[in-house]
Each structure stands twice: as structure tokens, then as C-alpha cells.
């Protein structure tokens, strides 16, 4: 009997130890296609009116994870291959979730973050400044994104299983550089001395497994702009981080097409504000000389100041950097058996959210410039002169220079024609000279948000800080430290803080007060003035303390509902036509009879406008391999890295168009007989849309 009691007590003790060592959550992951209209719509990111879509290189996806603790507390996080997120879009996603699940999901426990690709269709942000280069609101983009964001959370919910979560980190070099290094140097020397690099090089991974240790998903946060593809790109692309996600998913979803398979792998944005993937640095495009460090300008005759990546062109640079990120994430996942770098995430799930009226925020904060406690306040939104200069990833127009702290009467006249800043605005934003007084512009609707979304998701001892903008490197480091210290003061030991950038609503950039004085692009785009970062530090410290103490906060004022005032200059598809003696799907250019490794296959079809049907979760074409006389198997789709689809309007009056399909035969391609099939829809001049299909001749890919 005594032995039995001892054994029983030992079992209880062991179970207690096991409870400390591991934690069970309900975890689920999901993915959905959010590819918008691939042609005739401007891309969001570079604000380049000439960057109009002409086809697809890779489709873009939204990837979600859902976590629930033993008490039923639940959070959902989404990383979307999009430039950023708009609150009108999030509000629509919540509406659809609540129509299905009731109040299970709401504003407070759902975070939606953009990867910041600059190669996807725009027109979904519902603020004029961000949609104006897209020629306004694009309902088709908004709808496919809203449904895809909803679907990825729904699929993650449907896939919930008992599981565990592990956190691991690794250093990834040769992927990013600071594109405003002179601004970074404005930060205190003693602060900079705490860090080896002027950008964050740490990749942070959350790994989701079931109770049998089967891998479900991996979400990775790394600070880098998704701007390997520059503003000359016209094909939809998820860019470097999106390609990394495709590689990661391919590894764990063997024999599946891109965007398919149970494993979900994401590369999410972090404090990437001043971080560029163009690691070869900025050079003058004609002379090859280095640009001026302060202004990012080149002398007359030496071209534009442009930074480039490690590849021979932007596509190869995207591929190289995506591979480096994927390799880093795979390295962490492949160590899961030893768990040498990973630690298990334990603890409950919590969330907190607050809307903040930034222009009317008043508080106090430590001023690193004066080294005193100052009263702080937000400003009405405004963009500075250096905003128009662009960045070394994508230069702007006219003669604007980065680092501009003085105004110009001519540009002030243009500014005042749109909206005139008050003297209070001008004083509030100093030393930023105001180029666009967006907070004073109301026609035809709000130009930039005034109310922001600040949110924290706590999963055990991990806190995800969902910020509504692009924090620079040091701005993000300070915020992480502030949240960690606040959590520690409230009893949270060894809290890991992850910054999720461009989340829930978009308000451009946030720099440190010191960086603000330099007025490079990021500072000129810090829309609420020099105290913007200090306000976020104040708000997130307060939210962290409330979160850790399980306290509630006032929800704050909701952003305005603007769905019914949206305007657009984009026209729909009127009709499609085809030349006499042809039909839709007719193959104008057949493939050659034989190809080798590294050759490129090209097939051209008479097509309808791709905007007639987005083929969401499907494909505009397939590359098919012959298995036997009766069976062909899909080898590649329009989501594959190896393929491209380019659409051309050949006759505007008659509505003629061609679709070119390219397949680059990679070394991994199996030899055999192939063909290419195109599916589309055309719009009849008298009304209605009708499907069509075209099929190329078969051709042979020979052994290398």
C-alpha cells in the first residue's frame, strides 16, 4: 500500500513537471488565394501611375493561424501578400466571420498584416492618398481580398487540433540593408552600441505542431521590404518574402501545386521601415557611382539613384533573397527533433485592442533630444517634401530630395490648392515642411487615417505587437524593449515580443524622434509629427500593462465608415473580340517541338480580358505532363515561380487581346511530353460572360 501511494504521488509530481514543460493549445492554420485583377489595375506600393498590371508571375495568398487556450481564449493572425492592410477591409472580414461564427472573432482578437509586396493590385485601402495612384477604389480587388482573408481564417478554424507551439530564432545575413543609414546614425551612440547592425537580422519563427509532433505550419517574422521587384515590374508577384513562403510550403507539401497542401508557411513583416532588400546599395543608374548619402540624388547626367539586389536582374534578386530566407526557416524546422534552438511556448492566450485618435492624443514622454520629460501631442496627418523624393528602392518624381527641411513657394501653392495646413499644423510638424496637408483634405473623402488601430496578441510568453504602419529599425527596437519591460513589471518574465508591421490599418511610417530631424523619406512619411513614436510607446506600454493584468481598456473611437463614398476612375471590361477566322483560345504561337533544361517555352493565345474571371483558387493555365495515352498531370500553374503570363491589348476599339504564357524549364523538370492549356472567359458585346479554352500542341522536354 505504501509503495502504491509513493508511486501515485510520483506520477502526480511527474505530471506536474510535464505540465510545466509543455502546453496544449488548439491550433489551426489556413491559406487562401487573394490575387486581384492582374491586368489594367495599378499596383499598390510605389505609387507609380505607370505601374499597371499586365499579368501574373506568382499568385498572392493570405495565410492564417488560430490559437485557442484551455479556457477558450482565441486569437487569429493573418499574413497577407499585400502592400498593407486597410481597416475597411478588416471590418468586412470581421463581418463575414461573425456571420458564420457569431462573436467568436472580432476586432480585438483578429490581426491582419501585410507582407508589403509592391507587386499586387491596389484599390482596397479606402483612403484617397493610398488609392489615388490606383485611380481610386477597385471593388474587384476589395472583394477577392475580403473573401480570401475570411477564408484563410475559416480554414484555420476548421483545421483546429490539439497541438503545441515552439519559438525559435536565427540570424540571417545578406538579406537586408538600411536604406537611410544617415538617419539611423542620429540615434544616440550608446543606444546604437547595443546592436551589431543597423538593421535587425533576426528571423523569429513560431512553429505549430500537433500532439504527434506533425508539422502544421510555421510563421516567420523578418524585417525587410518586399521591394526586390522594382517599379518597372508589371506582373503580380509576392516578391522575396512571398517566394520564401512558396519554397517553404513546397518543402512540406510535396507533389502539391503552389497554394495547395496542409502545411502553411508564412514570412511576415516586422519593423522594416528603413530596411531594403537591395543589398548592393544605391548607385547612380548611368554612371554607376554612389549616390549622395544625405539626399539620395545623383549629379546631373549620372541618372537616378537606384539600389539593386544581388542578382543579375530584379527577378533573380527576388529568387536569391527568398531562397536565403527559406533556408533560414528550414534550418530551424529541421532542428525540431533536437529542439536545440526552440523553446516551447507556454501560458494563456489574451488580446487587447484600442483605437487611438492620434491628432488629439496628449501625453508625456521622455525626450531623447532634450533628455527631459516633455508633453507630447499628435499632429493632423501630413506628408513632407521628402515623401515625394521616394526611396532608393523606388525614386520619386520631379526634383524632390530626401532630407529636405525647407519649403518651396511653388509647391506650397500647389499644396494649398488641395488643402491648406494651419499655422498650428506647420508648427506641430517641424522640422518637416508640409507638402500634403492630408489631415485637412476631405474631398472626396478622408485622405489618410486619423484614428489608428493598436493591438497586442499574447500567446503564452509571446506578445505580438500589431502596429498600423512601418516602424524603422530603431523605432521597432525601442518598442520591443518598452513592451518587454512593461510585461516584466506586470509579472511576465522572459516575454518574447514580435512586431507585426502594416497591420489592421495603414498610416505610412514611424521613425524615432532623432530620425525625424533628418527628414528623409521615412521621417517625411511619419504622418502624425515628431511625437508619433513617443505616442506609440506610451499607448503600447499602457496596453501591455492592462493585458498582463487582465484589465480592459476603453475601445476608443472607431474609424469612419466610408464604403458608401468610394470613387473610382477605373472602368470595367466593355467587351472582348477576336480576329476573323480565329476564336477565343486559338493558339497564335505554338511551342517548338523540343526543349532542353533552362530553355523557355512560349505559347500565345487569343484571349479575353483576365478581369472577366480572376480564377480565384484556380489558374489561368496549366503546364501538363503526359503520364500515358489517356492521362495528363498538371505540373505547373500560374502560381508557379517557373511560369509567367503576360496579357496584351492588341486592338482597343475591337477588344482584341493576346495572352502569352512562358514556362522556364528548371533543372528539376522531369523529361517527357508536355502541353499548355489556357482557360479564360470572354465578355460578349451584347452582354454575358462565357468560358473558353485553348490547348497547345504537345512538345518534348529532353533529358539534360
From Swiss-Prot:
It is found in: Secreted. Residues 1-23 form the signal peptide. GO terms for biological process: ceramide catabolic process; long-chain fatty acid biosynthetic process; sphingosine biosynthetic process. InterPro entries: Ceramidase_alk, NCDase_C_sf, NEUT/ALK_ceramidase_C, NEUT/ALK_ceramidase_N. Its EC number is 3.5.1.23. Coiled coil: none annotated. It catalyses: an N-acylsphing-4-enine + H2O = sphing-4-enine + a fatty acid. GO terms for cellular component: extracellular region; membrane. The keyword DNA-binding does not apply. Glycans are attached at residues 230, 362, 550, 598. Keywords: Glycoprotein, Hydrolase, Lipid metabolism, Secreted, Signal, Sphingolipid metabolism. Belongs to the neutral ceramidase family. This is Neutral ceramidase. It comes from Drosophila pseudoobscura pseudoobscura. The lineage of its organism: Eukaryota, Metazoa, Ecdysozoa, Arthropoda, Hexapoda.
